[in-house]
C-alpha cells in the first residue's frame, strides 16, 4: 500500500468527482495549467494499482508516483465537508465491466476506521491518496522497491540507465520545468531541480515550425467551438433559472427549504457558466493572437558536466515532463570516438496546441509531429555543438580533455565522474548552485559556495541563507543564471547574453 498526502487547500466535492471521472477535463481552456488533462491521476493509477482511496483537502499529484497500483481511494476534507471516492480496476476486471454506474457504496471496514484516515490530514484542508493492490513483477516481488529509506525504486532497475528512470525521488526532481511547490517523499524533502540552472554553456534557440501556423488555426477553431458550446450552456442555465422564477413568482420561496436549495443550485449553475464563458472568450482571444503571430518554440541546450551519461532531449508539455533523455540521431550514431553531442541535454516546453500528450503523460499523440520536433532538435543540437566548439582545433582529443578536466577519466561513457574534491570543486565553480527557497519557493542562483559543494544544499534553505547579502530576503526577484541566445539569420549568427526567465 502507498499513501500520498497533500496539505494544501482541498478539493470541493464537485471538483473531486471531476478529477476521477474519465474523459473529463477542467483544464482544457486554461493554457497556464500543467498538462492538458492534468497530471495523469486516473491513467497513472490504473497502470499501477488495483484500488485507490483518495481523501482530500485538495490535491496535487504526479503520475510518476501513481503508476504502481490498480486501486485507489481519495479522502478530501474542506470547509467541514468530508469526501471519500473509490476507483477500482480490480472490480471492473473481475466482472468484465465496460462501464458502471455506482448507486451505492459498500464499505468493507467500519466507519471508525474509515474516519481515522481523515485524521491523517493534519490541517484544515488537504488530500490523502491511498493506493493498494500494488502490481507485481514475474518474480512475485512488487514492481516498486521500498528498501531505500527515503526513496522508491524500480525492482528490476537497470544500473546503466539514467537515475530518473530507476528512482522516484530523482524523477520527481525533474518532473516540472519550473517547480514552485514542495514535494516530500517518505518524509524527506525532494530537492527539485530547475534543469536549465544545472547545465554548462546554456544556449537558447528559437524555432518556428512549418506547421505552427496550421496548429494555431486549429487551436483557434477549437476555442471558437468551445465559446459556442459555453454560450449555449449559459443560455440553457439562464432559461432554467428564468422558468423557475416565473413559476414561483409571487410566492415566498424562502420559507420552503427545497425551493431555496433548487434556486441556489440553478443560480450557481448560471454563475459557473458565466465564469466559463469569460474563460473561453479569453482563451479564444489569446488563440486569435497566436493565430496571427505564432509564438516560436524555444530550444535550450547545455552540457551536463555533473552526470554526462544523462543526456538527450527533455520534452515537457506545459511545464510537465513527458519524455526524458530522448536521444536524437546525432547522439545515437556510433560516435564514441568523436564524442559528438554526447553529454548534451536539450530542453523544450511544447504547448498542447502543437503536440498533445497521451493520457498517461508518457508520450505524445501525433507521432508525425513528434518526429518532426525531434528532427528540429537534432538540427539545432548540431548547430549548438558547432557554436560551443568544445573540441577546439584538437578534434576528439580536445573533447576528451574537456571531460577529463571535470573528473571523467574512464573511457566508458556510462560511468560516473570521480568524486574527488578537486574535480567536484571544478564542476560547481563553473555552474554554481540553483536553489529553491523553502519559504517563498523562488529560485536563487548562488555562485560557488564551498559548504554547499562539500555538504550539499540544506533541505530548508531560505533566501535569508543566501551567501550574497544583496539577494537575501524573499522580497527579492528571482536571480537566474545567464543563457546565450542565438538569433539565426540566413547569412549570420548573433549570440547575445540574457538571464533565463
PLM regions with names:
Residues 1-35, 49-62, 67-317, 321-323, ...:
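Interdomain "switch/hinge" adjacent to the Bergerat
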Residues 37-39, 345:
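Short glycine-rich loop/turn motifs that provide flexible caps or phosphate-binding loops at active sites
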Residues 39-40, 59-60, 334, 448:
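Short beta-alpha junctions and helix-cap segments that line functional grooves
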Residues 40, 44, 64:
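Short alpha-helical Gxxx[C/S/T] motif in the catalytic ATP-binding
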Residues 41, 91, 95, 359, ...:
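Solvent-exposed, flexible loop/coil residues
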Residues 44-46, 81, 453-455:
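Short glycine/serine/proline-enriched coil/turn segments at secondary-structure junctions
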Residues 187-204, 215-501:
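Conserved GHKL (Bergerat-fold) ATPase module
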